[in-house]
Each structure stands twice: as C-alpha cells, then as structure tokens.
C-alpha cells in the first residue's frame, strides 16, 4: 500500500514515518510540508539520515491522488477540514490526526476550537477512530481521536458500556508531556517554565471534552457532563490519566478486573495490570499500548482507573496506523508490535 503524509515535519508526522518504516505492507510514496519543500527530512531531523530520503513536497492533491492509496493528515486543527476533501472525494483512505472531523456537531467544533467547521457532509462521512470500539470497520475516512480522549475513553469504557456507574460522578485528572503541545514553542512550553514544574491549563475548556462526551453519551445517554482537568508535566512523552467514578452498587476488585479483562480480551494494545499494580508512563513510552490499573475503595465507594499512553503513538500516529490496519484488513498489530522504550 502506498501512503502520503501531509504535515510530515510535525511530531505526529515524524511518528508516522518512524512507525510506517516498520510496516511490511506499506511504502511511503510522498511527504508533504507547509513550512519546507525540496529538502529531505534529515536536513531538519538528523536522526533520519540515510533512513528516509523522500524529499518534502508542496501539497499537490492531483499528484497525491495519483501516487497514493492512503493519505495521513498530521496538521494542526483547522487545516484538514479543507485539504482532506479532494482525497475523500477521490475514494482514497483518509486518516486525519487533527480534530477537524471528530465532532459531529459543527457548532460544538466552532465553540471549542474557535474555527470554522468542515462541511457537514464530510463530517457525516468521517468515522470516529477509537480503534478498539470502531463501529464501521470498513470505513475509509477516519477522524483519529485525540490523545486525552483516547486515554480517558479506553480507561472508562467497560464501566460506561455496562452502565455500572453513577453517570454524574465522572472526574478525570489528565496529565500530558510537553510534546502534546506540538512542535511550535511557546512561553508555556519553554524549558524554564516546564522543568521541575507542573501547570494546569485549559481548565474546564479543553477541546477534547466534547469529543469525550460525544462518545460517552453514545455508550450511555444519561451521562450529563464530566469534570475534566488537564496539566502539563515535565516529561517529553506520555499521558497519565486518573479517572474517579462511583459505581451504582458496590463492586469487588475481582469483579472489576474481570470486567476489564473480558472487555479487552481481543484488544492487542490494551493491557490490564494485575490487582494492586498501577501503570507508569515509562512502561508505554514510544509504543501503541494503553496500560490500565484499577482500584476500588469500599469505604468511599469510588473506583479509580489509571490509564497511560504515549501521546504521540497510541494518542496519535500509532492509533492512526492501527486504524489503517483495520480498514485495509491487515492484522491490527502490523507495524506496531514492538517493545516500549525503557528506561
């Protein structure tokens, strides 16, 4: 399969290149960038020297359609809503890593992203690509989920789908490494601001909130809202999500683990930790795994779920490739089965 990557110089694009080089059924046909053309990626990223020689090109939709079967769009939000359309119309596989096609309500997108929304007919065509819970496995236009949304939804899905929790009780405390803010530097991601520091940001206003709610209410329409906070922590990669919920009825630790293990029995990238063991960010670094730990406090009747992912892999490029595997009828783990980087 021939693929093109638009937005190849960003962190998400770089991860796509790294991972696709390990995929036996995929060849990179073209690489595209808004900020640089004619040079190779190794000019900007020396770690790719002698590994990726394709030149960076301007975006030429006719050329991409001619040379590719699949297009990955790894641009900031607000760009894919325009540039994705010709590839969808041409019948190519299109996987958008931005937020432009995730929300089915155009007004919600414009409220939370502060940008004009994509045409409604294209939003309707896009399949939300939470890989473990895809509705239409044959879909060829995928809105890849956000990193916070992925960690949160995988962490809470078994309880919500089973309708075992008080729908008003969901509290999510999510923390991200600095790469989640993207490649373009800012005052808030400056080394001296982030090193030995932790910063709460976008309190009650993160754009992944409506995305999470859209999927949660699909599973349980009685959920009215969630309490959701996000923080930056001084690591390069990783999402560490702690979720608190109250079950409708008391539950044992064994019942909790049985529920999660049965839900994810056939999910190659979700690993449920043993009882009383909780995952760390380090154990999923540079991998497509989501590791989940569980606890129940019978005194407070609170379930705690710890869900960790690498924001650039399971939270972006890795899940995008997992979605490609599903749509192309490859093995779901093709190009993604490797040991996390440790230490």
UniProtKB/Swiss-Prot annotation:
Its main location: cytoplasm. It catalyses: N-acetyl-L-glutamate 5-semialdehyde + phosphate + NADP(+) = N-acetyl-L-glutamyl 5-phosphate + NADPH + H(+). Keywords: Amino-acid biosynthesis, Arginine biosynthesis, Cytoplasm, NADP, Oxidoreductase. GO terms for biological process: L-arginine biosynthetic process. It is found in: Cytoplasm. InterPro entries: AGPR_AS, AGPR_type-1, NAD(P)-bd_dom_sf, NAGSA_dehydrogenase, Semialdehyde_DH_NAD-bd. The keyword NADP applies. The active site is at 147. GO terms for molecular function: N-acetyl-gamma-glutamyl-phosphate reductase activity; NAD binding; NADP+ binding. It holds the Pfam family Semialdhyde_dh. Catalyzes the NADPH-dependent reduction of N-acetyl-5-glutamyl phosphate to yield N-acetyl-L-glutamate 5-semialdehyde. Belongs to the NAGSA dehydrogenase family. Type 1 subfamily. This is N-acetyl-gamma-glutamyl-phosphate reductase. The gene is argC.
